[in-house]
Regions:
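N-terminal secretory targeting signals
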Residues: 1-90, 96-97, 220-224
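Catalytic glycan-binding domains that act on GlcNAc-containing polysaccharides
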Residues: 67-224
Length: 224
């Protein structure tokens, strides 16, 4: 398959603080677990992996920063593009999330958490489409929860052990984006493999292809 490379987090104090030197701690994770190169798991059956202390700390810092999703912009043009993005995505999402207030809050949070982790917001929206069909309280057969179908064990590994918080919009999106960013760094930017790892089906085409296809529904067409 072709190698798909996702963007790195942009420069800025906020991103430097919680995601410092991702390649270094991603390598530490690869060395810390023997499961990385083992047999492919079935979809939805991903296993908890041992994390190096540096990886655990980086992810914990990413999750526990409780500031609200209030974006800042370099200039008025960037802010205008953001507003256009919100309008476009809101129109596309209306059928799935008919309540305007809920839809706006969801999109603002998804945009913020995606950018915070250096991800394309459209990719995150496509992943959510595949994972939960935008159902806040979705629970999979293996117990994954919420919009981004986060496995509860992550709350023990990098959170505060509050599994019910995975049904909180911002908490769920923050976990999901941080975990996907970690997998991207583990896979040296290979989005295809990172998506497979997110789903517990690394190396199998069904899930990555589904997300990449859904991503097309959320591509931003900037008029600026």
């Amino acid at each position: 398959v072709d190698t798909l490379t996702a963007p790195r987090p942009a420069n800025g104090a906020d991103r430097r603080r919680w995601w410092a030197r991702p390649q270094r701690w991603a390598m530490a994770l690869a060395l810390a677990t023997g499961a990385l190169h083992g047999p492919n798991a079935h979809a939805g059956s991903q296993k908890e992996e041992a994390l190096a202390d540096s990886v655990r700390l980086a992810l914990s810092n990413a999750i526990l920063d409780a500031r609200p999703p209030k974006p800042t912009f370099r200039n008025p043009a960037d802010q205008q593009r953001y507003q256009v993005w919100l309008a476009q995505m809101s129109a596309r999402l209306q059928r799935r999330l008919p309540d305007q207030q809920v839809r706006t809050e969801f999109l603002e949070t998804a945009w913020y958490e995606a950018h915070r982790a250096g991800l394309d917001p459209g990719l995150v929206l496509g992943l959510i489409q595949v994972e939960s069909a935008y159902r806040k309280y979705a629970v999979s057969m293996v117990g994954a929860r919420g919009y981004m179908q986060v496995m509860p064990f992550w709350t023990n590994v990098i959170g505060d052990r509050n599994r019910s918080a995975l049904f909180n919009m911002q908490t769920n999106l923050r976990y999901g984006c941080a975990i996907l960013r970690m997998y991207l760094d583990m896979e040296a930017g290979n989005l295809y493999l990172a998506l497979g790892r997110y789903n517990g089906s690394r190396g199998r085409p069904e899930y990555p292809n589904a997300v990449l296809s859904a991503w097309q529904n959320w591509k931003f067409k900037s008029p600026l």
